[in-house]
Amino acid sequence: MVLVDSSIWIEAFRRQGDVHVKLALKGLLDEYEAAWCSVVKLEVLSGARKEERKALTTRFSIIPFLPVTEADYDWSVDAAWKLRERGHVVKSTDLLIAAVAQRADIRVYAQDKHFEIMRDVLGIGLYQPGYNGMYNPGTE
């Protein structure tokens, strides 16, 4: 299972979006390995065009959902402190997404550089697609 960040969903749904991202997301969806959480849903759906909203809501309804818990908020606060001590400031929403993935022991697929910082400082796992976007079951 891979928690797909909003940066990937948004890029994949752009008309001129990166074809590699589109293929990689398709690979995760085809293998039933894509997951989402409420933070991702908020980020994606709040920026969706009116004509896309129903299709996106339907798509999210059939993908595995990982809830955000109080423990995820606590983890995010601790993570923010660790990052700040090393000179990094990361958005609260990205911290929550990382917390959900960390608790579920799964990787995050993101284009956002903050996740690379969190990988380096906090040890979160990041997903790297396989050849031509095929699902890569291995670790980072």
Question: Where are the language model's segments positioned?
Answer:
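Active-site neighborhoods of divalent-metal-dependent phosphate/nucleic-acid chemistry enzymes
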Residues: 65-109
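General small-molecule cofactor/ligand-binding pocket signal
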Residues: 35, 66, 127
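Short, well-structured N-terminal submotif of metal-dependent ribonuclease cores
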Residues: 1-36, 45-58, 134-139
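A secondary-structure boundary/capping signal
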Residues: 5-6, 40, 111
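Generic structural signal for small/hydrophobic residues in well-ordered secondary structure
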Residues: 5-6, 44, 76, 101
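Structured helix-beta-strand junction loops
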Residues: 31-32, 62-63, 86, 104, ...
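Acidic, PIN/NYN-like endoribonuclease modules and their adjacent C-terminal/linker elements
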Residues: 1, 98, 102-140
